Amino acid sequence: MAPKQKDDDFVLTLSDDENDAFNNFDVDGDDGDDGDELASSGTKKRKRDTAETTQNTSKKQKQQKPVKNGLKKNKKGQAETPAEEEQEEPQEEEDAGEDDGALDSDFEFDVGGVANTVVEGFDGWGMGNAEDEGAAKKGDKKAVDIDDIISRRQAKKEAAEAKKKKKQSEAQDNESWDGVAEDEDAESDGGMSVDFQDDELLAADGFGMGADGEDESDNEEAQDESGSDNDSDDDEEKDSEDDDDEAASDNDSVATPVGHPEDEASDNDSDAESEIDAEEQEKRKAFFAPEEEKTKEQADGAQRSFQEFNLSRPILRGLAAVNFTNPTPIQRKTIPVALLGKDIVGSAVTGSGKTAAFVVPILERLLFRPRKVPTSRVAILMPTRELAVQCYNVATKLATYTDITFCQLVGGFSLREQENILKKRPDVIIATPGRFIDHMRNSASFTVDTLEILVLDEADRMLEDGFADELNEILTTIPKSRQTMLFSATMTDTVDKLIRVGLNRPVRLMVDSKKNTSLTLVQEFVRLRPGREDKRLGYLLYLCKEIYTGRVIVFFRQKREAHRVRIVFGLLGLKAAELHGSMSQEQRIKSVENFRDGKVAFLLATDLASRGLDIKGVETVINYEAPQSHEIYLHRVGRTARAGRSGRACTIAAEPDRKVVKAAVKASKAQGAKVASRVVDPAVADQWAKKAADLEEEINEVLEEEKTEKQLAQAEMQVTKGENLIKHEAEIMSRPKRTWFESEKDKRAARKLGAAQLNGPDAGLSKKEKVKLSNKDKKRLDDARQRLEGKAGWKKGKAEREAPKPAKGKGKGKDKKKGKN
């Protein structure tokens, strides 16, 4: 009886049910009575097991009344499932009789079989998960909404205007009642003479009060003529000065045309770059793996589908779910090499699918990993938070039908939640360098000893001076025996830079490695003549109000300028969002989501958004001013015309931007891309610039109100922090202090180097640092200030010092003699 009691008490799990159902199938294909008896006995046993288990649970229901109803429902469900199985099993037995346990030889993977799960319009920003939404809502700072401030101010203005109109109407009513008396007074005063020469008695909008003198009207006509001349001059290309040379030769036949010094310097630089040093070629030959000769099938692009890479079915199903059917050139080259475990240095134009090029082989390799012990094996590093969030969304979509786990270590999100996820040892970690190092040094649950694959996306940016210290800290900590993959649209192949990453005979996979743009991109340039640089905002407002009215990204060099233009757009009724490093993570994600969903028409961003950001439907990119280098320009304009779609890029360029503009035009002409010059009427631009200038006072008031709200939010946060310190003092004090690998001084120096890479060496000169002055410097500054104020005393020169001095008391003696007489 004892063994029987054990069998009765045993509760089947889901896997046990599946094994029993599988064992009930007759593998030999006999549809005899034996199979029916086995099936019936199996179902009877399950009936008995479920009945006894429900009886055992019913005894406990008397003590647990709150969960009584739920258990009754489970009991009913358990009683109904065997009956359903009895009806379905005969059909399964008939199917199993014809199956020999192997797959049909004619079976093919049906890409269209997942048509119901295809994500239409997938762009990497589909944050539909509640987990992602909850993470996005947890910002470190309290957000201050500019739209709320502007709407409040406009509501106040409208209320004040309504009140003013009401008073005026009341005054007019009172005047109408007293009209008869006023007419009589006017008749009685008919013989009096009134002097109207006083300016205060005349209305400002009276007839003739706004008329200008003849000289002023002549000046305006002259300005209009010069404006039309400037308008006609804007038709010429950015890199040519032929019309100016012809005009100079007409005026002075002796003068010869002289090229612009910046043009000559850029020509010399391009010549120097084209002639690669023989020593550098030898270095590259020794550093990179030899390039394999292309077969005829590879040259013809024979691999037209992902199925020809021999990928696993869960990966193919995930690719079909996001509507990836045909591999791009960079994917065709990268996936076979990455599956072999080789190091890779890859480059391709923006929007060519570089993220999937390294995610797909990583997922394929992880499907064959040991599953007994969870281990973190892959680290993908990104330069910006938005790019890391986007890569995380793409990777999780591609791995939908696998058991591979992911974790994103991004600044701005909760450290505690990230530590809890790291305790589960996720397979793939997608991170920014700063937060990766933070967890590496301060989280006990995070170990990097098991990493097997390292990916650096936008690697040329990661190799710059701003990220050099952080990257070196990571590379010296993780294992050296790893696979390393570097990708970027402007990937460098200079050995001195790449050797720092610790690559082992990497394979160069350069697709469109000549720093080209997409062929579907139309590049436009608006030229600002010398002396009109202060009208730049007027040109931008005209373009956004009249020409490009929707799905536009506007790039700025500085956060301050982007924020100020954001306020101008709001005051002029243009729906815009901003994206830069001074915003909290909650605000940054909200801005991208609002722009992606079409709630705002313009995204005003710094170079934070220039790399990797993939938002579907971006029609236009406007450069408020040309960037520091041609590489940054390529990344900026690469936000549009992605994946074969068309797009436009418009750059407002002045004389300081000549070098970058010329490089862009030269590369585009060599590639065969379309380049055009857009002409904007200077008078129209001046009108918009005047509108922006008239809003200057209101802009400052909005900035002041925003500053006040931020200070209030900061004060509230400090109060909350103090309350938490008092309430949870023991827990907070018991936490170990977080450490960092460099001092504050080193961090400031790295920040300066990063700013210089983006905006040039003079980027930080406008903001002066506080330096303690010596007494000598103070005296020099005081003397200079006194001279400017005119208070400095007269100082004798050499001639005055050498002149004979008058005798002492000579004048006084004469006065004394006169007094005595």
Curated annotation (Swiss-Prot):
Summarize subunit and interaction data from the UniProt record for this chain. Answer: Associates with pre-ribosomal particles.
Helicase ATP-binding domain location: 335-509
Which intervals carry biased composition (Basic and acidic residues)? Answer: 134-162, 281-299, 765-805
Basic residues biased stretches: 59-76, 807-821
Q: Which gene encodes it?
A: drs1
S-S bridge residues: none
Sorted alphabetically, the Gene Ontology cellular component annotations on this record are: cytosol; nucleolus; preribosome, large subunit precursor
Q: What SMART domains does the annotation carry?
A: DEXDc (SM00487), HELICc (SM00490)
Q: Which GO terms describe its molecular function?
A: ATP binding; ATP hydrolysis activity; RNA binding; RNA helicase activity
Q: Where is this motif: DEAD box?
A: 457-460
GO BP, one annotated term = ribosomal large subunit assembly
Q: Which SUPFAM superfamilies does the record associate with it? A: P-loop containing nucleoside triphosphate hydrolases
Q: Source species, please? A: Aspergillus terreus (strain NIH 2624 / FGSC A1156)
Pinpoint motif Q motif by residue range. Answer: 304-332
Q: Any idea what this protein is called?
A: ATP-dependent RNA helicase drs1
| Keywords for this protein | ATP-binding, Helicase, Hydrolase, Nucleotide-binding, Nucleus, Ribosome biogenesis, RNA-binding
The record's listing under PANTHER family reads:
ATP-DEPENDENT RNA HELICASE DBPA (PTHR47959:SF1), ATP-DEPENDENT RNA HELICASE RHLE-RELATED (PTHR47959)
Q: Please tell me where ATP binds in this chain.
A: 348-355
- Tell me which residues make up the Helicase C-terminal domain: 536-683
Where do the record's region annotations for Disordered lie? Answer: 1-304, 754-821
Q: What is known of its domains?
A: The Q motif is unique to and characteristic of the DEAD box family of RNA helicases and controls ATP binding and hydrolysis.
User: Pfam families given for it?
Assistant: DEAD, Helicase_C
Origin: domain of life: Eukaryota
Q: What class of enzyme is it?
A: hydrolase
Location in the cell reads: Nucleus, Nucleolus
**What's the Enzyme Commission number for this chain?**
3.6.4.13
Q: What does this protein do?
A: ATP-binding RNA helicase involved in ribosome assembly.
Compositionally biased region (Acidic residues): 27-37, 82-109, 172-188, 212-249, 264-280
